[in-house]
Amino acid sequence: MNLKKTENALSLTLKNFIKSESFGGIFLFLNAVLAMVVANSFLKESYFALWHTPFGFQIGDFFIGFSLHNWIDDVLMALFFLMIGLEIKRELLFGELSSFKKASFPVIAALGGMIAPGLIYFFLNADTPSQHGFGIPMATDIAFALGVIMLLGKRVPTALKVFLITLAVADDLGAIIVIALFYTTNLKFAWLLGALGVVLLLALLNRLNMRSLVPYLLLGVLLWFCVHQSGIHATIAAVVLAFMIPVKIPKDSKNVELLELGKRYAETSSGALLTKEQQEILHSIEEKASALQSPLERLEHFLAPISGYFIMPLFAFANAGVSVDSSINLEVDKVLFGVILGLCLGKPLGIFLITFISEKLKITARPKGISWWHILGAGLLAGIGFTMSMFISNLAFTSEHKDAMEVAKIAILLGSLISGIIGALYLFALDKRAALKK
């Protein structure tokens, strides 16, 4: 009965999100595998040289642009973080994070799932040049995790899918805070003041309920530039922009014109092809329906396929390729063990222990329809760090620590793969056990 209520409570938006993210996870995996194959083939020199190719335009001796790798990591990933920011805002206002009662359990779970892996890594790498990589195993890749959980189908309770999504959103918010606090260097306050001025303009547009996305996006580009120049990673600008996008729907949302257009279409004669009148009516319905959506919904709807099917796969292909040969020093400090143990052990233990303790102390309440065994399974899948972990590894290790970065990437791939396989087998076995009891 509770399971049925949970199923009904799952909104259409959330269902669409699950479907798109699950396919995106599979597509991400294929691109990661392709990157590893190419990076260890006769094409490896071309593969690595490609990402250092400068792209931009030149005026005399002045060049405006970046290497292809920086375009992906700094510009395209800003669009990904913009979408993440929109998802977080939506969940904070209307979703599973909209009240303390709803949010407390997954938020505390996310907190435990970040602290435990970070501590494991830091403990193993304390007082070494690699200790700055503690943020790497703290992340969860929602696309991969949902890809695995959706492959299990009905063997996984819907309530667990909702919990994993909410946990991952809270985890993303935590990752953004970690990036802002610990992976920011050489702050330039003049540019920060410029960024603050742009944020105030965005807040004014939001206050005026400006529904056109164009001014927000134009100011967003300016904000990205100011933040990029300030020393803070530019993806933070995208998250700030997301929180400034209006979420209110227009007051005339119960638009009678839309109903009238529907009636007009129903009254037209049907044939093998649409008539000109029917095409015009459908076009008007499309325009009216779009106008009823909030700017946040429109932008999120636009970014979701671009992020899932282009940006993230491209990021995976550009960053997952590591040439595994004798030149790699797998004994760089304890990076390999720190990342793998953080993802495979720290994530599930952190999530399980902190939620178990918080419920016993009556701070939170476990969602109906899922057992503690399910929570442990979700913790295992949360150990799939992949793209977010890769992103943080690029921030944690500069070109001076190339060995550590390469080892971290291998560890992320291994740790994510182990977590995914163990998590899937565990939830499959859990379902079989429940079926036998029946």
UniProtKB/Swiss-Prot annotation:
How is this protein positioned relative to the membrane? Multi-pass membrane protein
Q: Which domain of life is it from?
A: Bacteria
Alphabetized UniProt keyword annotations: Antiport, Cell inner membrane, Cell membrane, Ion transport, Membrane, Sodium, Sodium transport, Transmembrane, Transmembrane helix, Transport
Note the InterPro entries from the entry: Na/H_antiporter_dom_sf (IPR023171), NhaA (IPR004670)
**Which reactions does this protein catalyse?**
Na(+)(in) + 2 H(+)(out) = Na(+)(out) + 2 H(+)(in)
Citing just one GO molecular function, the answer is: sodium:proton antiporter activity
Which HAMAP family does this UniProt record tie to the protein? NhaA
- PANTHER family tied to this protein: NA(+)_H(+) ANTIPORTER NHAA, SODIUM ION/PROTON ANTIPORTER NHAA-RELATED
This chain belongs to the protein called Na(+)/H(+) antiporter NhaA
